[in-house]
């Protein structure tokens, strides 16, 4: 099979660099060009030392981009939308890792991000969560990567709402997130002496990924997200507090997950009765495209605690985007992604 050429815009950041790492091992992809204004002329390993010896590519300025089969855009929010015409002319297949085209509802976008530069294009991209939108992705030329916190939340809650397991009451979500979720650009909040050893509530209300969660969950339930920053480099642990319908049992919860995720290559249900590793832990999915999902039901009250662990840069960003590309191209879904995490 002839390889498809792929270029990455914004490849010096964490999201673009992670897509590059995965793409370099993909048997059907040839990485053609990678861009960075700041590091133009520098070899890739100058910014991503883990890729030393894996590629001889050097960063180029975006103005020197040539046409390719696939263009991955890992730009700050708003940039791709403002320069859409220029970038869309370079490749028939576009994969956007920013928030620019994740939402279809212009009012939701306005509430969380402000005015959209290209509201006429909202709804033209397919949301890159294969577990939810596999059929739509099969014919998608424009793909919008999901937010990392939204990915963790959606994967944990979607089967329960689809099966009618939950009461129509507000769902409260807490997200323990890592430092890399803030991106490669340094800030006072990410400065090591300020961040190391700290567990900081940084977004108690109004988290932007709430919009994606609400728009993509069945019935558009009332969901409230609180984000807590930890000093881990990678990983997200999502816990959701909700209530099951009267008379519903643990068996019903199991059934909802098994029906939704039967045969899913990157979903693992983690709920053991004994041992140290009874529930999902971001440590064991670090660097992988797996999502570990678990739960615990308080039978006498009906309170259900749902847990999801993912790597924010892989399953939360570049990994699910590459998985979506595999679906789009008709390739085996696990290509470039089929590897386990580390232990210990």
UniProtKB/Swiss-Prot annotation:
Catalyzes the NADPH-dependent reduction of [LysW]-aminoadipate 6-phosphate to yield [LysW]-aminoadipate 6-semialdehyde. This is [LysW]-L-2-aminoadipate 6-phosphate reductase. One of its GO terms (molecular function) is N-acetyl-gamma-aminoadipyl-phosphate reductase activity. One of its GO terms (biological process) is L-arginine biosynthetic process. NCBIfam families: argC. InterPro entries: AGPR_AS (IPR023013), AGPR_type-1 (IPR000706), LysY (IPR037535), NAD(P)-bd_dom_sf (IPR036291), NAGSA_dehydrogenase (IPR050085), Semialdehyde_DH_NAD-bd (IPR000534). Homotetramer. Interacts with LysW. May form a ternary complex with LysW and LysZ. The gene is lysY. It catalyses: [amino-group carrier protein]-C-terminal-N-(1-carboxy-5-oxopentan-1-yl)-L-glutamine + phosphate + NADP(+) = [amino-group carrier protein]-C-terminal-N-(1-carboxy-5-phosphooxy-5-oxopentan-1-yl)-L-glutamine + NADPH + H(+). Belongs to the NAGSA dehydrogenase family. Type 1 subfamily. LysY sub-subfamily. It comes from the Bacteria. Changing residue 209 to A: Does not affect activity under basic conditions. Strong decrease of activity under neutral conditions. It holds the Pfam family Semialdhyde_dhC_1. Keywords: Amino-acid biosynthesis, Cytoplasm, Lysine biosynthesis, NADP, Oxidoreductase.
């Amino acid at each position: 099979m002839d390889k498809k050429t792929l270029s990455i815009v914004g490849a010096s950041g964490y999201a673009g660099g992670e897509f590059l790492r995965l793409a370099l091992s993909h048997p059907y992809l040839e990485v053609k060009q990678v861009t960075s204004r700041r590091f133009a002329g520098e070899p890739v390993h100058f910014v991503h030392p883990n890729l030393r010896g894996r590629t001889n590519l050097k960063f180029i300025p975006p103005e020197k981009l040539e046409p390719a089969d696939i263009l991955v855009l890992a730009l700050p929010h708003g940039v791709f939308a403002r320069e859409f015409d220029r970038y869309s002319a370079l490749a028939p297949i576009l994969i956007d890792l920013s928030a620019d085209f994740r939402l279809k509802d212009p009012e939701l976008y306005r509430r969380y991000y402000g005015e959209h530069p290209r509201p006429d294009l909202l709804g033209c991209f397919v949301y890159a969560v294969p577990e939810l939108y596999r059929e739509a992705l099969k014919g998608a030329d424009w793909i919008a990567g999901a937010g990392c916190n939204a990915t963790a939340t959606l994967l944990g809650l979607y089967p329960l709402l689809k099966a009618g397991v939950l009461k129509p009451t507000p769902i409260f979500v807490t997200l323990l997130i890592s430092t890399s979720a803030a991106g490669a650009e340094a800030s006072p909040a990410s400065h090591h002496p300020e961040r190391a050893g700290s567990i900081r509530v940084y977004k108690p209300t109004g988290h932007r990924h709430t919009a994606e969660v609400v728009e993509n969950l069945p019935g558009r339930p009332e969901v409230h997200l609180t984000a807590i920053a930890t000093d881990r480099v990678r990983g997200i642990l999502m816990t959701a507090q909700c209530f099951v319908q009267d008379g519903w049992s643990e068996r019903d919860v199991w059934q909802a997950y098994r029906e939704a995720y039967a045969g899913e290559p990157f979903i693992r249900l983690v709920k053991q009765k004994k041992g140290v590793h009874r529930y999902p832990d971001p440590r064991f999915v670090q660097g992988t495209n797996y999502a570990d999902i678990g739960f615990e039901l308080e039978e006498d009250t009906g309170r259900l605690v749902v847990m999801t662990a993912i790597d924010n840069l892989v399953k939360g960003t570049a990994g699910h985007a590459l998985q979506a590309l595999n679906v789009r191209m008709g390739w085996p879904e696990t290509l470039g992604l089929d590897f386990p995490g580390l232990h210990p």
